[in-house]
Every structure is written in structure tokens, then in C-alpha cells.
């Protein structure tokens, strides 16, 4: 969708906007890599309507309004308690995206931005029924790195292997695990690894005919599947530092990421922005459906 020269040129324009972002520390929200991806995709697609599923503090809403001032934005979240940025002309909705009637929107001119941490397999029937064409998915991680299905997994024909980590220091979760364990609530093929600081649970693959059918149908409708590249070379250790440090996970050598936009010696950013690079990159993607 984009060549490198276009992306390099547009990063300069983006940074002029991004330096004035309202939330400097957007922990758990979009940072520089994904905000730049969203910026470029918005300028490319130019939707008339934008449905933002997952608001958090409102940084993404701010970027949507900044890039496309005349687009109608619907911002959805079941919990607005963390919101810091609010607009009078944005329609805020507090139920799941599936609970609203979107029939009046021109689907060819409507973009959905999914950043709600909901399994993408649960969105397929909704997308099919409503005939949405343009989708951006934020947390598009591959297998072994997230606890639910993402477009990347479905596109690459991966079936979810779910992992769960429970620290003994988390009394509530540890107690809940003990109850589940002694009530035989885990399937026989679930694997347990009892570390001295935590428990690692690896669940078996669950595939049924309906799930496979939905995945096949979705793949057949894809016209474009595009993963936006990281700004600089992907740093696996930096991105997954918490899991690697706290749960002794090994580095995955099968984690495929697109080639970066810049070499390290080609770009100079402030210390603040440099810290954001790779800190949240999750293979953000754009999907265009038939």
C-alpha cells in the first residue's frame, strides 16, 4: 500500500502533529509506531465515517479528529472512566459495537478501528452481516503472543494456542486457579508448568467446524491484508520485556515482522520518542473486504 519513500516523507509531517499529542505517556494505548500507521492509513482511505472500538484515554480519538476533521467519528467503549480527551462532536457509545444499528452508514466510506482487546473471531459474523469493507486492527499479534484470535492468525491459518501466567503474589488469581484445578475444570491436555514464582498454563488448540468455516469465509473475502511496518528494526526484547523478564519466556525466532521504514542511522528522534519505538508495535494491519 505504501512505498518507503512515501512513509519516510510523511513521518516528518506526522511528527509535527504528534509532538502536540495531548497524552504524553499513553501507557496501554497507541504509541508512535501505531499512531503513525493510523495517520498514513487515514490519509490513504479517507473515510467519511469512523467507528473507533476501544477508546482508553482518547489519544486515538484525538488523532482521528486531527487528520480527518470532517469525518464523523463514533467512539465506543464499555468503560469511559480512563478517558482524558473528549470532543463535543464525537458520538460516544458505551455498549459493544455489535449492539448498534449501522445500516445508515455507507460501508464503502466507513472505517472501523478495532483497539478493544476482543477476540477477532467474535467479530467475523458482525462484519459479514453489516458488510463492512475497511478495518484496522491494532493488537494484531501472532500465535503464542496473545490470548485471542487476531486477523494475522486467521490470515496465516494459525489456530490459537492460549497461554496464561499466574503469579503466586496475585492472591486472587492464585486462589481462583486452585479452585479450578481441584474441581477438575481444566481439560486433560492442558499443560501446567509450576515455576517458583508463577504458574504457566498452556491450553490445547480448540477448533470446531463453525470456526473453521468462518475463517475460510473471511479469508475468501479479503482483497487487501496489509501489515504496517515498524519505524525502525523490530526489537523483540524491548517489545516483550515484561513477559521475558517476569515469566522466563524464550525469544521467538519465528516472529515475522515487515522490514522497517528506517535504518537506525537514518532517523533522529528525541529521547522521549525513541523510548516509544517498538514499545507497543503489534503488527497493526489494514484489511479491505469484498
Where are these regions (language model features)?
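A short alpha-helical cap/connector motif
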Residues: 1-111, 118-290
